[in-house]
Amino acid sequence: DILNNYRRKTYDIKKRETIFPELPLPSKKEQIVSFPQDLRKIFSLVSVGSKSFLTQKVDRTVGGLVVQQQCLGPLDLPLSNYSVVKHSFFSELATISGIGEQPIKGIIDPVAMVGLSIGEMLTNMIWGVIDDIDYIKCSGNWMWPNVDSYEHYLLYDSVKEVSKILIELGIAIDS
């Protein structure tokens, strides 16, 4: 049996206290000098910059079933809260997709970040017609550095929180 010959991977998970250093405010002169750099940093944030890596994963037009895309307008910007794709030309059923992401909050509190991300996803989808929360399914994407025992702990704690919230809501992760 091929699978029995592989060693099981084990993780050393350790919790530690996170200490944030005091953040000094820059002087007026420093603010003016750093403005272009700061602006570039702001536009590189997922919450502000392009979400094309999230919204352009599939061919959205060939089948003719796309009712609304998350990217809108002549510049194809991801401005819509949700997208809608019909199941067929002969049915009223459709799939609504919404995205929730809160990366900056994850720096301070990863567990709070996952709850806020789920809340954002549901709030974005509320504008589509959903008959019952039982019809909502999630797709989880764990993009985590996972390089040391503390990162393992944060990932484990965050996944536990996702599980707790989705079980309370009756929502499954199916991919």
Regions found by a protein language model. Name each.
Residues 1-175:
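Glycine/proline-enriched, intrinsically flexible loops and inter-domain linkers
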